[in-house]
């Protein structure tokens, strides 16, 4: 019995030992369990957002992750939020790998539901390496994510929030914030896009045959501002709904030339060459309300205000961008319309006050009124120069201003008497005419030196931007960025504030010093090409100027976007926060 017991004990011990040997055989997870993959689309369909959940002890090779649209040769580059780690791999040597979950994006245009994206990746674990894994995804089958990964950024920049974002957030959190836009409009009244509206309003109120009383002057100014506010509001909503192509269409050379001709005709009428008026039959019906569609008529004031809204609308500012951003994101057209209206109304109030008080301090009606009217005719001629400067080379802008100033000073000198103080003013006016005519002399007689000619054709800022033509070139350039951040300037020839950036901000020595640590990129949006449209849709650009900043992972830095003009000091401080 003892021998039998010993026999069975030895048998079970042997099986137990063998069982332990089998237990030492290592088991590995299936590839979908080791690297659980999922993908979604961004709301604007410009990003395919990929996510991998990596099991403990496993890792993905960074350089083995790739993607492309099936049937198209261009690969899609991956931008990840997480930094890869260095790893000594027994198969590939020292490589960069991901050992935890990955959130990344493939940028492109994913509007066609039938398109397919092929994503390939490969990973390993200790003692075992998986073959490359390929996923083929149909665009139409992907869910849409409500969050864009591109908006995330590194920790040091989370405190940044651009002014337009703060304003848009304010509208989301409190509808009472719309009244703050009226105050912001007061400040915008003194920007280069709105100030040219002052002479037009002054010409309407003051430049008429008889000096208006205070009530009539207020009514004219008020109607002018209402016309401007109405146009500004409607165009703002159109830009928010349609996008930058609508804004660019308003800046087409045909539109600029047409408006310029209109202002020239109005200016000539102020010189008394002719009178613009409605047919007699219609005048009798409308009576005094629209007896003359020249300066001083209520209908003319409102119409000129609407035209002024066209002139001012292309200039993008932070308050305007904030309102447009709110409309685009919320779809709340009513709040957006009220916000834009109050912004435009704030812009018009200072113009009204300046015009009203200017009208009040003038002496009573007399012969001087004709001189004042003709003076405002010259002022109105400045508006075509302002408009044409958006589409003409910079050298022609200076020639047009020189010609207008020269003619004005000669005319003004001829108005002065030959006695006493008037004679002194006459001499000074002729002297000023001789100074202002110099650019025209240089042009006609070709007396410019080689240096002057070179300066005319050289960008004012002398900052060297790498020109970008499309999204693919942008992605490649960002991937090769040797600096900590990259800056993308969206520019157009018709954009007045863009030229201000070039002349006043980018030329600043402090800003240029900071630019040495930044990859400088620029896209010319003047022609609104298909490539321009793709960039505009990808980054949800509301207007120009717009400047974007990207981090080392080639993602746009949240809250860093600049829209509207920013002076050198403010821009330098802004960059300092990013570096």
Swiss-Prot record:
TM spans (from-to): 178-198, 230-250, 254-274, 296-316, 337-357, 376-396, 397-417, 420-440
Membrane topology, from the record: Multi-pass membrane protein
Domain of life: Bacteria
Record keywords: Cell inner membrane, Cell membrane, Cytochrome c-type biogenesis, Disulfide bond, Electron transport, Membrane, NAD, Oxidoreductase, Redox-active center, Signal, Transmembrane, Transmembrane helix, Transport
Signal peptide (from-to): 1-16
Subcellular location: Cell inner membrane
Recorded GO CC terms: plasma membrane
SUPFAM superfamilies listed in its UniProt record: Thiol:disulfide interchange protein DsbD, N-terminal domain (DsbD-alpha), Thioredoxin-like
A biological process term (GO) from this entry: cytochrome complex assembly
Enzyme class: oxidoreductase
Alphabetized Pfam families for the sequence: DsbD_N (PF11412), DsbD_TM (PF02683), Thioredoxin_2 (PF13098)
Limits of the Thioredoxin domain: 449-579
GO molecular function terms noted in the UniProt entry: electron transfer activity; protein-disulfide reductase [NAD(P)H] activity
Intrachain S-S bonds: 124-129, 193-315, 495-498
UniProt EC number: 1.8.1.8
Catalytic activity: [protein]-dithiol + NAD(+) = [protein]-disulfide + NADH + H(+); [protein]-dithiol + NADP(+) = [protein]-disulfide + NADPH + H(+)
UniProt similarity note: Belongs to the thioredoxin family. DsbD subfamily.
Purpose of the protein: Required to facilitate the formation of correct disulfide bonds in some periplasmic proteins and for the assembly of the periplasmic c-type cytochromes. Acts by transferring electrons from cytoplasmic thioredoxin to the periplasm. This transfer involves a cascade of disulfide bond formation and reduction steps.
Protein name: Thiol:disulfide interchange protein DsbD
Taxonomic path: Bacteria, Pseudomonadati, Pseudomonadota, Gammaproteobacteria, Pasteurellales
């Amino acid at each position: 019995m003892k021998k039998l017991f010993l026999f069975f004990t030895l048998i079970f011990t042997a099986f137990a030992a063998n069982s332990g040997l089998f237990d030492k055989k290592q088991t590995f997870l299936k590839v979908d369990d080791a690297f659980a993959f999922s993908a979604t689309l961004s709301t604007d369909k410009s990003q395919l957002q990929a996510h991998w959940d990596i099991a403990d002890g496993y890792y993905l090779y960074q350089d083995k992750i790739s993607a492309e649209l099936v049937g198209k040769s261009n690969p899609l580059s991956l931008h990840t939020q997480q930094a890869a780690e260095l790893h000594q791999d027994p198969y590939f040597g020292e490589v960069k790998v991901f050992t935890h979950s990955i959130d990344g994006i493939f940028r492109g245009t994913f509007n066609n539901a039938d398109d397919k994206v092929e994503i390939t990746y490969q990973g390993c674990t200790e003692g075992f390496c998986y073959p490359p894994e390929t996923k083929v995804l149909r665009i139409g089958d992907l869910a849409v994510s409500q969050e864009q990964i591109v908006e995330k950024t590194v920790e040091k920049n989370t405190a940044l929030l651009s002014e337009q974002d703060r304003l848009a957030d304010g509208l989301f959190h409190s509808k009472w914030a719309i009244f703050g836009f009226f105050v912001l409009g007061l400040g915008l009244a003194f920007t280069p896009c709105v100030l040219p509206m002052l002479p037009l309003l002054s010409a309407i109120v003051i430049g008429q045959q008889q000096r208006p009383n205070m009530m009539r002057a207020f009514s004219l100014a008020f109607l002018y501002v209402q016309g401007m506010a109405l146009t500004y509001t409607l165009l703002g909503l159109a830009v928010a709904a349609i996008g930058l192509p609508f804004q660019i269409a308003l800046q087409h050379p045909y539109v600029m030339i047409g408006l310029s001709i209109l202002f020239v005709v109005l200016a000539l009428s102020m010189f008394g060459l002719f009178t613009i008026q409605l047919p007699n039959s219609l005048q009798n019906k409308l009576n005094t309300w629209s007896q003359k569609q020249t300066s001083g008529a209520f209908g003319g004031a409102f119409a000129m205000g609407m035209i002024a809204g066209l002139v001012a609308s292309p200039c993008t500012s932070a308050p305007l961008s904030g309102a447009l951003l709110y409309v685009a994101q919320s779809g709340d057209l009513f709040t957006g319309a009220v916000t834009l209206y109050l912004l435009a109304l704030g812009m018009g109030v200072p113009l009204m006050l300046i015009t009203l008080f200017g009208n009040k301090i003038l002496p009573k009606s007399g012969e001087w009124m004709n001189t004042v009217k003709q003076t405002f005719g010259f002022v109105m001629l400045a508006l075509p120069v302002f408009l044409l400067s958006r589409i003409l080379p910079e050298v022609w802008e200076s020639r047009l201003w020189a010609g207008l100033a020269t003619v004005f000073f000669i005319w003004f000198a001829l108005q002065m008497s030959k006695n006493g103080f008037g004679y002194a003013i006459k001499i000074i006016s002729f002297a000023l005419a001789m100074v202002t005519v110099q650019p025209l002399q240089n042009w006609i007689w070709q007396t410019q030196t080689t240096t002057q000619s070179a300066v005319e054709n050289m960008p004012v800022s002398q900052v060297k931007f790498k020109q970008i033509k499309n999204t693919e070139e942008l992605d490649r350039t960002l991937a090769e960025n040797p600096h900590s951040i990259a800056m993308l300037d969206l520019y157009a020839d018709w954009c007045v504030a863009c030229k201000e950036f070039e002349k006043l901000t980018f030329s600043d020595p402090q800003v240029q010093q900071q630019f040495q640590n930044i990859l400088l990129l620029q896209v010319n949006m003047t022609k609104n090409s298909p490539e321009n449209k793709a960039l505009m849709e990808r980054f949800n650009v509301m207007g120009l100027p717009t400047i974007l900043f990207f981090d080392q992972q080639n993602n746009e830095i949240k809250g860093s976007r600049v829209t509207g003009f920013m002076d050198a000091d403010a821009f330098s401080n802004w960059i300092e926060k990013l570096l």
